[in-house]
């Protein structure tokens, strides 16, 4: 279900740094373009040794009108980037995988952060979204889900349905 971010999250308010009689100098604070969360979820981590989960959010970028995803937290530890990743970048990586099994490391290219857990945690999120499934060869290899294209299109259509609902 879609939600607005809470009041506790960042607000775009300029901060007055210094002032004289003629001019007020302000410092630009970063803008949060992801105030409209359209889906939140959790996905089981890839390792068979744990029952812990990775939590993710999907939001609409308020200027680009594009879907982005981020890993918001995880159970049991493991550092990861909380950067927002364009969903179309992830689907572009998945689109070229074809029928062959692939490693989580194919996801490294969508991150600017370099945490070792990023690719694996994002692959877990993609499994949670039903885009990919475990390969028969290994718990750490993936293949596209049989209904990948349908699931991808449904996911990408969230931006259309949410913007029409406003």
Show where each model-derived region lies:
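Long, low-complexity, charged/polar intrinsically disordered regions in eukaryotic proteins
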Residues: 5-82
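A structural signal for long, well-ordered, hydrophobic/aromatic- and basic-residue-enriched core segments
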Residues: 75-93, 128
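Short acidic, hydrophobic short linear motifs in intrinsically disordered regions
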Residues: 86-90, 96-111
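Short amphipathic alpha-helical interaction segments
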Residues: 112-128
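A short, conserved structural fragment
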Residues: 127-138
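Minor-groove-contacting beta-hairpin "wing" of winged helix-turn-helix DNA-binding domains
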Residues: 138-145
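Short, amphipathic alpha-helical interaction segments positioned at domain boundaries
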Residues: 146-166
């Amino acid at each position: 279900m879609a939600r607005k971010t809470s009041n506790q999250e960042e607000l775009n308010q300029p901060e007055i740094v210094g002032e004289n009689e003629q001019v007020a100098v302000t410092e630009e604070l970063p803008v949060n373009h992801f105030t409209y969360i359209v889906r939140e979820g959790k996905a089981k981590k890839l390792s068979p040794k744990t029952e812990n989960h990775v939590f993710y959010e999907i939001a609409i970028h308020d200027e680009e009108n594009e879907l982005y995803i981020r890993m918001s937290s995880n159970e049991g530890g493991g550092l990861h980037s909380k950067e927002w990743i364009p969903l179309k970048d992830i689907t572009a990586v998945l689109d070229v995988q074809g029928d062959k099994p692939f490693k989580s490391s194919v996801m490294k290219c969508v991150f600017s952060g370099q945490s070792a857990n990023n690719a694996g945690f994002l692959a877990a999120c993609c499994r949670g979204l039903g885009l990919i499934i475990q390969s028969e060869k290994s718990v750490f290899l993936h293949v596209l889900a049989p209904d990948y294209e349908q699931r991808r299109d449904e996911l990408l259509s969230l931006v259309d349905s949410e913007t029409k609902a406003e």
